[in-house]
Amino acid sequence: MSRINREEFARLMQQRVLVLDGAMGTCIQGYNLTPDDFLGGKGNNDILNLTSGDVIEAIHRAYVAAGADIIETNTFSGNAISQKDYGMENRVREINLKGAQIARKVADEAGRKVLVAGSMGPTSKSLSLSPDASDPGFRPYS
């Protein structure tokens, strides 16, 4: 396993620029995935860790082959608030664990030091912005 501590990470960053992978969601769009792959919740890319792990693994491998030093887990929306939109809030732990395992496997098999970073995006809810463009004053919370 290619785990490093904070000091080693700082040393690596002083030696050279570390390359982070690119957009997971954009790459996913290039695959012919069906609603079944998303368990009916098209757009829930994180659930693909469970249903189409081979696709996520292939994307990670492509980024490593392109020279990425750091790959991010496919867990951008892996939180209970965002997953509730798809009825998957009870699978958050499973989604995140599998996402980390897939990335870790690819990093370990890279033949060079590749780091894994956990990806944590915002939730699908906003207190400061209206989710409805036609009603900018609307807030889903009172």
Give the residues covered by each predicted segment.
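Domain-level signal for soluble alpha/beta catalytic cores
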Residues: M1-S142
